Design a protein with these regions (language model features):
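Cys/His-rich metal-coordination motifs, chiefly Zn-binding "fingers/knuckles"
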Residues: 1-22
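General structural signal for alpha-helix termini and helix-helix connectors
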Residues: 15, 142-146, 170-173
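Hydrophobic membrane-insertion alpha-helices, especially the h-region
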Residues: 27-42
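Sec-dependent signal peptide cleavage junction
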Residues: 39-53
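C-terminal amphipathic alpha-helix
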Residues: 55-115, 119, 149-204
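Mid-length scaffold segments of soluble, non-membrane domains
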Residues: 118-131
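Amphipathic, heptad-repeat alpha-helical segments
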Residues: 129-148
Length: 204
């Protein structure tokens, strides 16, 4: 057994002191290493959580836009039908209530469109599209700073959003002539569908 003090003078044995210091240094190194590992794990977990949240919002906004686009497609097709039938005096069970009064066609297609937008059911459908726009806008705000993993997906999503906005806006406030409205609406409709198909590549 080693002596902790000198038998001659009673001073502490330096070998024992060095051994204690060595053990202390090892313990400190282990603690520092453990803290680094825990910190790295924490950063990794936080990064993964942010990626999962981002993906969830990206998926939600993609399907929310699809729902809004479907509503806009239905409304836009009805607008085209009312507009066309009012001009060319075509009878149709779906549009007669807007294009005809007292058994006769209205003199101005604008009157028919006004009747359509004043209709409670159609007005509610337009309100649903506007609500959809609001929900989509709020979700898009949360996606402005994508993780590196989703930067490419966000670029595709922005194009999808632009096409979705054009499609929903033209239905909420139709302008131009029947021909220009129909052409623009069909273009926005097709572009929105194409954008969604591209976006699906980034969704599980």
């Amino acid at each position: 057994m080693g002596l902790t003090t000198c038998p001659n003078c009673g001073s502490p044995n330096s070998a024992v002191k060095q051994k204690k210091n060595k053990h202390k240094g090892v313990i400190i190194s282990i603690i520092v290493f453990a803290l680094i590992v825990v910190s790295a794990l924490g950063i990794g977990i936080s990064k993964k959580a942010k990626e999962l949240e981002y993906y969830s919002n990206m998926e939600t906004v993609s399907f929310t836009m699809l729902d809004g686009a479907a509503k806009a497609e239905n409304a836009g097709n009805l607008i085209k039908s009312v507009w066309y039938n009012a001009i060319y005096e075509e009878r149709n069970s779906e549009t007669d209530q807007y294009t005809m009064k007292n058994g006769k066609f209205v003199d101005d297609f604008n009157d028919a469109l006004s009747e359509l937008f004043a209709d409670e059911n159609f007005s509610n459908s337009i309100s649903e599209i506007e609500t959809n726009q609001y929900e989509v806008a709020n979700l898009m705000k949360q996606l402005k700073e994508p993780p590196k993993k989703y930067e490419e997906a966000y670029s595709v999503l922005k194009v999808y959003y632009d096409n979705y906005l054009k499609m929903t806006k033209i239905v909420i406030s139709p302008t131009g002539s029947l021909n220009t409205f129909s052409e623009d609406f069909n273009t926005y409709d097709n572009n929105t569908v194409d954008s969604y198909e591209k976006m699906k590549l980034y969704l599980d």
